Amino acid sequence: MRRLLTLLCVFWFPAMLLALPAPKEGDYVIRDFQFESGETMPELRLHYTTLGLPRTDKSGALKNAVLIMHGTTGSGQQFRREAFFKGLFGPGQLLDAREYYIILPDGIGHGQSSKPSDGLHMRFPKYTYTDMVRAQHALVTEGLGVNHLRLVMGTSMGGMHTWMWGYLYPNFMDALLPLASLPVEIAGRNRMQRKMIIDAIMNDPGWKGGEYEEQPYGLTAAVYAVIFMVSSPLQWQKEAPTREQAEAFLDDRVQRYTSAFDANDLIYQFDASRNYDPQPHLEKIIAPLFAINSADDQVNPPELGILDEEIKRVPNGRYVLLPITGETRGHGSHSLPALWGVYLEELLEISEP
């Protein structure tokens, strides 16, 4: 039976892709972008992918645009992976790409958008989450001509950006879905782990102030911290129940992460959260908002009790905590629509214009 299901998926997923509008990729260049630090870039490139076509109502307002934002070290391409893609964008799914206009940007410093590894290295402007959200807004409004969003959602860092969209542009969207995030300053263990990642690179003599010829060993040390930052104890025990399997599991992840990351980019990506703090602005968020976290998320552990209290300040907010099951994946549960799709469906229903 399992083999049959596997074969069905192998043939069904490509067939489903043929039934959907082809993804479109592009770049939008913002001229003379001024960062929160006061630094400027003559040309800031933002890469993006779109699925579907925009549709307007009788007043000319867009009614089907959806913005989905990725996590730290990621890109918009991560939402084209099978579990997310077919779970949300496929025919008959909640965000069917034949019905919605889906926008998947690469944030500043990520993917194919402007980033330190393009050549500026540590001379790249010290961007923040505020800069990233402002640039996303410029892409959406000026680059793509979108004047309203049906839904703003994001995973991890993208979830944090979703909170920011809610108070920076409160009338711009119908609904908000932050996944795997908290609406408070990054402190405690979370900030300590980020500092460990940054220090592991910058304290390595091979980093050379960012002017290395090959990736410094400090990147590998940083990757160890990244891996355990997003770990899932239950699932990892199931996947690696012996010493040999555990070591092979770790070695594989270290190799994949180090081959995908750049040391300077990683420093910027994790430090961009340094002044993130939506807490003073939560009452400004007026669109219906469902904040979804999972009980096995080591980045946003529910025992802190933060969302239990802060969600009370969001006028139309609701906190959903997914219980630990055999299907949750710790912090990575944010990318499994099968776990939280029922709540997205409810959010879309109650926020219908």
Regions found by a protein language model. Give the residues of each.
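N-terminal cap/lid subdomain of alpha/beta-hydrolase-fold enzymes
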Residues: 49-118
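Conserved acidic catalytic loop of the alpha/beta-hydrolase fold
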Residues: 130-151, 168
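Conserved hydrolase catalytic core segment
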Residues: 147-190
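Alpha/beta-hydrolase-fold enzymes
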Residues: 172-256
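Active-site nucleophile elbow and catalytic-triad environment of alpha/beta-hydrolase enzymes
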Residues: 265-281
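Short beta-strand/loop motif that positions the catalytic acidic residue
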Residues: 285, 291-293
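Conserved alpha/beta-hydrolase "acid-adjacent" motif
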Residues: 298-306
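Catalytic active-site module of serine/aspartate enzymes centered on a nucleophile-bearing elbow/loop
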Residues: 314-353
